[in-house]
Amino acid sequence: MTTTAPASETQTFTVTEEINVRASLEQTFASLVANMGRLNEAPDGTALPMVLEPHPGGRWYRDLGGDNGHLWGFVQSIKRPVLLEIWGPLFMSTAATSNLLYRLTETPEGTLIKFTHTLVGPFPEDHRPRLASGWAALHARVRKAAETAAK
């Protein structure tokens, strides 16, 4: 027997952040790619190595070894060193999908990163507070690594 349920109201959630980095566009973009990939960590500092294939259609996934892992998304668009856009389910095990948008612009002090994460679809209420803090932790590592490389 097949049953259908009426669709509920579409849920959307958006996280935005602006990050000022005292490093060049190139250093900041390289730090972003590295820290979203092999240098990734959970907010508590636990290693969470990911693979980010930085080209259109490239995958962003957690490689657990032995052909096991978790697909987080695909590179939707990339224009080095000013744009990185990723689309996919990220860490959600629901029907939700996300769009991550990083726009980098040169400033007199270095680089400004404008970040937007838009999530559409069902997702647990208890995930909402952790979304912003997780991205903030990643962005702090990106800034620190880029600024260290700039010295």
Regions found by a protein language model. Give the residues of each.
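A short, structured loop/turn motif at beta-sheet edges
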Residues: 21-26, 76-82, 103-112
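Hydrophobic pocket/interface hotspot
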Residues: 28-32, 60, 75, 86, ...
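Short, solvent-exposed aromatic-acidic interface loops
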Residues: 90-93, 116-122
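Short acidic N-proximal helix/loop "leader" segments that mark the beginning
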Residues: 1-16
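Short beta-edge strand/loop motif at the mouth of beta-sheet-based domains
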Residues: 16, 23, 34-71, 81-83
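Short glycine/serine/proline-enriched coil/turn segments at secondary-structure junctions
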Residues: 67, 92-96
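Hydrophobic/aromatic beta-strand elements that line small-molecule binding cavities or substrate pockets
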Residues: 17-19, 71-77, 89, 98-106
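A conserved amphipathic terminal alpha-helix motif
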Residues: 119-151
